[in-house]
């Protein structure tokens, strides 16, 4: 597995545990790419859902993917401040086609005041039965929910006060 290079434009593909495509982001600019970490940015990019419907993102976003954690984080820049959407997912993989991960349903939405809500627990329970997630997946995801909430409280990693703004400034250099 390689990793995307700085300045490269890539697609992001989200899959379900059973291998079916969940969602695709058409274009994300890579701001940092290493074996263990990818930071990207996009703005008004086309998103295609598994049923073929498409929509366009409304605001600039900074995307954080790590090879050692079972989550990814999207920081969305809005007028009221930065909102974060955190997907509990497999660590990322990258090939010539796209940056890829498996979406495990659970999400955490973080508000500008750093309060947060765990979302889609019902969807997780349903899909864990239908797709037969092994018990180890449940253990890993619970551990990563705890890790993620700790990062939120500590303002660590993508939740650090200047993280999103700093990477957005870098993204602007590629847009002009």
Swiss-Prot record:
The active site is at 23 (proton donor). Pfam families: DUF402. Transmembrane segments: none annotated. Its cofactor is Mg(2+). GO terms for molecular function: magnesium ion binding; nucleoside diphosphate phosphatase activity; ribonucleoside triphosphate phosphatase activity. InterPro entries: DUF402, FomD-like_sf, Ntdp-like, SA1684. Keywords: Hydrolase, Magnesium, Metal-binding. It catalyses: a ribonucleoside 5'-triphosphate + H2O = a ribonucleoside 5'-diphosphate + phosphate + H(+); a ribonucleoside 5'-diphosphate + H2O = a ribonucleoside 5'-phosphate + phosphate + H(+). Its EC number is 3.6.1.15, 3.6.1.6. Mg(2+) 2 binds at residues 105, 107, 120, 123. It is an enzyme of class 3 (hydrolase). Mg(2+) 1 binds at residues 87, 103, 107. It comes from the Bacteria. The keyword Metal-binding applies. Has nucleoside phosphatase activity towards nucleoside triphosphates and nucleoside diphosphates. PANTHER family: PTHR39159, UPF0374 PROTEIN YGAC (PTHR39159:SF1). Belongs to the Ntdp family. This is Nucleoside triphosphate/diphosphate phosphatase. It comes from Bacillus thuringiensis (strain Al Hakam). The lineage of its organism: Bacteria, Bacillati, Bacillota, Bacilli, Bacillales.
């Amino acid at each position: 597995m390689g990793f995307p290079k700085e300045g490269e434009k890539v697609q992001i593909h989200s899959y379900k545990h059973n291998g079916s495509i969940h969602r695709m982001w058409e274009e994300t600019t890579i701001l940092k790419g290493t074996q263990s970490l990818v930071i990207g940015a996009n703005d008004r990019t086309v998103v295609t859902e598994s049923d073929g419907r498409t929509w366009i993102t409304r605001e600039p976003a900074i995307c954080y993917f790590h090879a050692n954690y079972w989550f990814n984080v999207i920081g969305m820049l809005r007028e009221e401040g930065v909102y974060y959407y955190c997907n509990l997912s497999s660590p990322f993989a990258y090939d010539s086609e796209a940056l890829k991960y498996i979406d495990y349903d659970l999400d955490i939405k973080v508000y500008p005041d750093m309060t947060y809500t765990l979302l889609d627990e019902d969807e997780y329970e349903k899909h864990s039965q239908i797709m037969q997630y092994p018990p180890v997946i449940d253990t890993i995801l619970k551990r990563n929910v705890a890790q993620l909430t700790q990062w939120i409280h500590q303002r660590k990693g993508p939740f650090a006060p200047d993280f999103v703004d700093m990477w957005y400034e870098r993204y602007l250099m590629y847009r002009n």
